[in-house]
């Protein structure tokens, strides 16, 4: 994240800020919660900010003085913990034995208890030379009295300790005195360093600078000074930030969710970024879906859950449509009378395109596997299914995966063909044109054939494939592999992000989900993917949630511990995402898909619970 330091304030400006009783940086007014006086030494101070919300409290900002004194550039240390300064040089893996462990323990204690720390600790420059760090750590509290950031002010002092040469070091950094003398007078004065930014109008700062930052960065920038704090309280700015970071379609969907306006864009951005308000709850709804069935497909249209088809008694394919309106005070399943329904089927996909249009593809019918396409406008009067006769269709299949691109294009991948043959192809159908034509997406290399996997869209035109029942030679096995493809490229190709010995596969940090199929994949704002449920072997819990951000340089799996009552079972074909902020899991606690009067809801924002 990018921060702008307040450490260039002149003495008069700093005193004015510290004495202003109307507040400035933080809610409720009052003095600035970190010692401005410490920034006014004759010699400049290092200034470091860490994110107390994230695991291991990563560094999110260092000022120029820190870089010049320690020899570490900002890009080398951002995202890491400050403890690297206790190691002698960039190649050292352990804390140096001369570093006082009692002081380190006291620092940890103060951070854990949320209190300020003051003391001295031996640190090392990048070249391995020692210096004493007169350190002051101050916790910063958010609106809900939780610690959001920790500010560290560092006054570095030369120390005469002969430690000998540093292994792997080929150069010697300048001494601290030389660095201080090299600093121009203007660089020591914060107000001069920031005047270029503050000469801009509020409109330019908000619309041309702040709106282009990520939600995390905007939250960080708000702590720089009073003016930026006030600017970042504007709801229109936060909406623009969310739109730029998450896309217009996601923003539009979020606007339709009940309660979003009451929560506000600033709070919504925070909760959907940190997932701090995510919670499970169990719901009971009225109505019924008769006859009972399994292996149906569910999809969300706005705040409505739509269920189509399924496998009835004696493997009877179904072709009826049911709707559950979650906007209702008392939601209940209602049978929708539609004209010209498709042939009955199960193992198909049901996908939403163009707002209120539903697309059915494939599945297993009375006469075998299908590769037909039907579209239903749920808001039409009366609703009528119509068949789309796309040219050059894919092979008939079931238990494939599908997703939508740009709101108009259907993408179909894999599945099971005749005689149990697993497929590895990927097709695209543009439903916005009058006579759609199926187009296979060619790739020099494709992931192993599979069924029961998921496709997720992120970053505009990128798709991510996860899991499924994959084929390797004569063997079929549950998979936890991750593959991505960028469809904006001239020649799209599959890339293996993580995998079990796949070509070019990486080894992600964290704990990867156990291999599975027919699981749930939830697209989160910003490109992150949430995985849970499905068919998992062994004693692993299917209700455990796993988070992956494929946009990171080194994607890392993270386990999420969400409060509430999660379902013991969740199936991909029976789960849908409503409004971009709620995952609705159909079926009872014991996994019986036909118990559709019981739902489990994963809410990602507090206004939904």
UniProtKB/Swiss-Prot annotation:
GO biological process: flower development; protein ubiquitination; rhythmic process
Pfam family, one: PAS_9
Compositionally biased tracts (Low complexity): 1-17
Residue intervals of the PAS domain: 32-114
Keywords: Biological rhythms, Chromophore, Cytoplasm, Flavoprotein, Flowering, FMN, Kelch repeat, Nucleus, Photoreceptor protein, Receptor, Repeat, Sensory transduction, Ubl conjugation, Ubl conjugation pathway
Species name: Arabidopsis thaliana
Domain of life: Eukaryota
F-box domain boundaries: 195-241
Cell location: Nucleus; Cytoplasm
Modified residues (S-4a-FMN cysteine): 82
Miscellaneous information on this protein: 'Zeitlupe' means slow motion in German. 'Adagio' means slowly in Italian.
Kelch repeats: 292-342, 345-392, 397-445, 450-501, 516-564
Function comment: Component of an E3 ubiquitin ligase complex that plays a central role in blue light-dependent circadian cycles. Acts as a blue light photoreceptor, due to the presence of FMN, that mediates light-regulated protein degradation of critical clock components by targeting them to the proteasome complex. The SCF(ADO1) E3 ubiquitin ligase complex is involved in the regulation of circadian clock-dependent processes including the transition to flowering time, hypocotyl elongation, cotyledons and leaf movement rhythms.
UniProt name for this protein: Adagio protein 1
Residue ranges that the Swiss-Prot or TrEMBL entry lists as coiled coil: none
Pathway(s) of this molecule: Protein modification; protein ubiquitination
Effect of residue 347 to S: In ztl-25; long-period phenotype, but no effect on binding to PHYB
Impact upon substituting residue 317 to S: In ztl-24; long-period phenotype, but no effect on binding to PHYB
Gene disruption phenotype: Accumulation of ADO3 protein during the morning period and early flowering time.
Family designation: Belongs to the ADAGIO family.
Primary localisation category: nucleus
Domain called PAC: residue spans: 118-161
């Amino acid at each position: 994240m990018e921060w702008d330091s307040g450490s260039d304030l002149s003495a008069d400006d700093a005193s004015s800020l510290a004495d202003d009783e109307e507040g400035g940086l933080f809610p409720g007014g009052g003095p600035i919660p970190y010692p401005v006086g410490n920034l006014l030494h004759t010699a400049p101070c290092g200034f470091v900010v860490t994110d107390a919300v994230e695991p291991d409290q990563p560094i999110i900002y260092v000022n120029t003085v820190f870089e010049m004194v320690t020899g570490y550039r900002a890009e080398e240390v951002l995202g890491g913990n400050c403890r690297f300064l206790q190691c002698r040089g960039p190649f050292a893996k352990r804390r140096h034995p001369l570093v006082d462990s009692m002081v380190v323990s006291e620092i940890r204690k103060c951070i854990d208890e949320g209190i300020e720390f003051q003391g001295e600790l031996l640190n090392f420059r990048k070249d391995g030379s020692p210096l004493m760090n007169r350190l002051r750590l101050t916790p910063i509290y958010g609106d809900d009295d939780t610690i959001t950031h920790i500010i560290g002010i560092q006054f570095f002092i030369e120390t005469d300790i002969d430690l000998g040469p540093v292994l792997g070091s080929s150069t010697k950094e300048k001494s601290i005195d030389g660095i201080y003398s090299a600093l121009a007078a203007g660089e020591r004065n914060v107000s001069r360093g920031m005047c270029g930014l503050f000469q801009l109008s509020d409109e330019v700062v908000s619309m041309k600078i702040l709106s282009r930052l990520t939600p995390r960065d905007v939250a960080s920038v708000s702590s720089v000074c009073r003016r930026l704090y006030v600017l970042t309280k504007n709801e229109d700015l936060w909406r623009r930030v969310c739109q730029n970071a998450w896309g217009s379609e996601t923003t539009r969907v979020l606007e339709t969710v009940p309660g979003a306006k009451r929560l506000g864009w600033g709070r919504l951005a925070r909760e959907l970024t940190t997932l701090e308000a995510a919670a499970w709850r169990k719901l009971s709804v009225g109505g019924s879906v008769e006859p009972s069935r399994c292996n149906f497909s569910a999809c969300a249209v706005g705040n409505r859950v739509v269920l189509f088809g399924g496998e009835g008694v004696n493997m009877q394919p179904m072709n009826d449509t049911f709707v559950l309106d979650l906007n209702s005070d008392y939601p209940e399943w209602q049978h929708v009378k539609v004209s010209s329904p498709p042939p009955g089927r199960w193992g198909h996909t049901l996908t939403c395109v163009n707002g209120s249009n539903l697309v059915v593809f494939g599945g297993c019918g009375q006469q075998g596997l299908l590769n037909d396409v039907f579209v239903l406008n749920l808001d039409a009067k009366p609703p009528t299914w119509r068949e789309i006769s796309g040219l050059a269709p894919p092979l008939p299949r079931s238990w494939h995966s599908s997703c939508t691109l740009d709101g108009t294009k259907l993408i179909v991948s894999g599945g099971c063909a005749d005689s149990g043959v697993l497929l590895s192809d990927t097709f695209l159908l543009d439903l916005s044109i009058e006579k759609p034509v199926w187009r296979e997406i060619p790739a020099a290399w494709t992931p192993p054939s599979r069924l029961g996997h998921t496709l997720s869209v992120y970053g505009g035109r990128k798709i991510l494939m996860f899991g499924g029942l994959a084929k390797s030679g004569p063997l079929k096995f549950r998979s936890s592999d991750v593959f991505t493809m960028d469809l904006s490229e001239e020649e799209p190709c599959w890339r293996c992000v993580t995998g079990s010995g796949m070509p070019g596969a990486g080894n992600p940090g964290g704990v990867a989900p156990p291999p599975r199929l027919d699981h749930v994949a939830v697209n989160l704002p910003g490109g992150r993917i949430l995985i849970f449920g499905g068919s998992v072997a062994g004693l692993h819990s299917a209700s455990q949630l796993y988070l992956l951000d494929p946009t990171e340089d080194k994607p890392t799996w993270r386990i999420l511990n969400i409060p509430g009552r999660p379902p013991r079972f969740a199936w991909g074909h029976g789960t849908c995402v409503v409004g971009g902020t709620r995952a609705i899991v159909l079926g009872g606690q014991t996994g019986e898909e036909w118990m559709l009067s019981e739902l489990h809801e994963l809410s990602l924002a507090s206004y939904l619970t």
